Amino acid sequence: MVNTPVPGLGSCASRGLIAAPASIIRSRPGCDHAGECIVVCVGVFRKDWVMTSPKQRPPLVPGVAQTFPVLPLRDIVVFPHMIVPLFVGREKSIRALEEVMRGDTYILLATQENASDDDPATDAIYRVGTLATVLQLLKLPDGTVKVLVEGVTRAQVVQYTDRADLYEAEAISLPDEVGDVVEAEALARSVVNEFENYVKLNKKVSPEVVGVVGQIEDHAKLADTIASHLAVKIPEKQAVLETVKVADRLEKVLGLMESEISVLQVEKRIRTRVKRQMEKTQREYYLNEQMKAIQKELGDEDGRDDLQELEDRIKRTKLTKEAREKATHELKKLRQMSPMSAEATVVRNYLDWLLSIPWGIKSKVKKDLPFAQSVLDSDHYGLDKVKERIVEYLAVQSRANKLAGPILCLVGPPGVGKTSLGRSIAKATGREFVRVSLGGVRDEAEIRGHRRTYIGSMPGKIIQSMRKAKKSNPLFLLDEIDKMGADFRGDPSAALLEVLDPEQNPTFNDHYLEVDYDLSNVMFVTTANTLNIPPALLDRMEVIRIAGYTEDEKAEISRKHLIPNALQKHGLSAKEWSIDDAALLQVIRRYTREAGVRNLEREISTLARKAVKELVISKKKSVKVTAKNLETFLGVPRFRYGEIEREDQVGVVTGLAWTEVGGELLTIEGVMMPGKGRMTVTGNLKEVMKESISAAASYVRSRSVDFGIEPPLFERRDIHVHVPEGATPKDGPSAGVAMATTIVSVLTGIPVRRDVAMTGEITLRGRVLPIGGLKEKLLAALRGGIKKVLIPEENAKDLADIPDNVKNALEIIPVSRMDEVLHHALLRHPEPISWTEQPVSGAVVPDEDAAGVVAH
């Protein structure tokens, strides 16, 4: 606030008056004198101010209408006790001032509703104003007038007179209504406290005002004083002026201040944030300029800048037309950006990715068929079908100029060499090898990349792997393709449809690159443990099954690969440690039971570690592992080799099962007990296997007389069928013939041969239907010491894929009906009986449902 000294009157503060707040005092240079303006009130008034004569003015009588000249105001509300300098330019306003000077009366200061109206109508002027006295008046050469007025009291306009030369109105003075003094005092204290906070936030209000406001004891004057300093809209100030009750006026002022303080706090936060950002930008600019200066001093100014280097890379790279246009456009956009902007970093990273992947850079594919065959044979023993397919592909490549890369899917249990086979194929063909693990991938963006709109976005695994390979015709090994999942982010297996389709992958489009990239020269090899793959994806691949290894193959793999690797890893020589054939066979048979060779490798490594320990501690020259001392190194054998059971038993049948890790022997047990004809099945069996047991039971019951079983026996006995290892879920129909054999053995009391295993699905008519996974099941039978295996007759054609050593070691008998199964599996064939149905005296109500099967 500025206290303006008035000659002969002293300062505003000394007279208990208030000057116009600095927040609303402003100059209007070049004003066209079309209306009143507020001028800056600083320093001492000029000597050419005309002082009003100190005549006795007529007294103001509350409630009595008196006539006063009216001075319409723009953009300001004058409160009582407020001293304001005004700039007057309108004719009517000047005449009103002259009228006041002649009669030495009060002038009514009323704010007009529309500040842009030069000649407002009487109904466009607020009805409540302030009666004021003219303290000083200054006439300017151009006819305008500067005047200093002092507010005295509020007044309500009753009506305007008909004078045309000036505004004149009859008005009633409005005295303040004090009301509840205690309430007013409480509000006054709150208003003063809030005003202090307001002044701290609003730099346009002088801090000296707080001291002046704190000394005001009159609550009405306090409200008017603070209201005059608030930077609020004219209607809000007018509402304060029109409030006669002091308590209500203080409450309105308090509400306006709280609203303004909230806005000022937000403004302060914004200013602080903007200032901090500007300081950061200026600091980065300063540091960058310093770095450039340092580089110049070091002699690096001759080096080309990043943009020039990017332009040269675009020219050198063999981009497609689409990619070149995209790169040129992005480079042009980068040139127009500030180097420090975040968008520039995004564009620079994009160009770096686009230019880093190989465009038309191929490695020379080897077409030497004998070399490829020798590489595959040296790295892997067996796997003839896979090797044959690879050599066929190379043979076609040697004759044809262009051939879309084959997409092979190697399916087999863990540990059979699927992943290492992919590396060998790359070595045999002379391609770069890239492995992409898909296990656990659930996001489609992992394959196709993220769009550049995301922060930290990058290409998908395909483009990343191409950048790693640095060639456009590598070998891609997509590992564990059956372990992908799908969730709300998309299905990655659907994204792979484009990658693995030779018709689509020449125009593979990554979300990040946004340009087509040719994947037709890439050779894709995928691996999986099962064929649990979406049909559309499976249709795009050539499936090659890799079954488990035979004992002979495992022994050969151990001699060629596992034992030499163990010697190298443990720092041993062939003279220091060796294992004879009998011991190696014992390790395979009695310490491992798997389709692959991973556990076998672990056992061989254990033997090597034991040998190193013996050589170091006992100072021996060499350690030889034999069948006699094998248990000294590896402990008690973990598995039994030979007959699955030690003797032929009633109701115990050996079935064959397929699992993800290869084939397994499946023991099925059955017992009969007195009861009411119920059948119970246990062993964590799933729905398909339960239905298979029901079908087997119905078949046996329908043929009971042929098997020498009296039909009433089914209603007097309960049968319980159990499959051990209850913690392992079991499902599938291939154990149907084994279930039927178990039930027949239990009901007839005929033992089952312990050296016979069987597999096949049974129908209600006793037919044996084909099954899958025959090779894995036969290998499991061979590992378990089985002599005779019964298989469905329709699976006999699959024996062509079975190794000769397996077929020679097993007696494989194809069967088509259940009678043949019982002939080979039971010690003796059941003898049929003659049975005549006895008449039933009354209806029999069964205790259980029609199926009679209870599963626990």
Swiss-Prot record:
Known catalytic reactions: Hydrolysis of proteins in presence of ATP
Subunit structure: Homohexamer. Organized in a ring with a central cavity.
Protein name: Lon protease
Lineage of the organism: Bacteria, Pseudomonadati, Pseudomonadota, Alphaproteobacteria, Hyphomicrobiales
EC number: 3.4.21.53
Cross-referenced PROSITE patterns: LON_N, LON_PROTEOLYTIC, LON_SER
Cysteines engaged in disulfide bonds, as pairs: none
NCBIfam families: lon, PRK10787.1
Domain Lon proteolytic per the UniProt entry, residue ranges: 647-828
